Amino acid sequence: MNLKPETLRRIDEVITHYPVKRSAVLMLLHAIQEDIGHLPPEAVQWVAAKLELQPINVQEVVTFYPMFRQHPIGRRHIKVCRTLSCALRGAYGTCATFEKEFSTKRGEVSPDGE
């Protein structure tokens, strides 16, 4: 995996803050996502090896938390609340408007990469 040297140093330093290596999984995932923008499958494998875990244990964390991205995202990231109260006030219509305006679907990157 091609991580910046400062990210690698930060990862090594973060691990020392935890009495059990596996406790550092969230921090490592955050550091990698900050560096490369998302968490590809090789990042999951790399973190698992680094923390002496099974890859499935890391993948569970990646898929559980919505702040982790498994695919590259555009330069701009638009979020629309879709809870019950927001849905009742038209959140899904707002989503449809964004999809039409940017020629994309929810979770995709627009054709211009923005």
Give short role names for the model-derived ranges.
Residues 1-114:
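Signature of N-terminal electron-transfer/Fe-S-associated modules in redox systems
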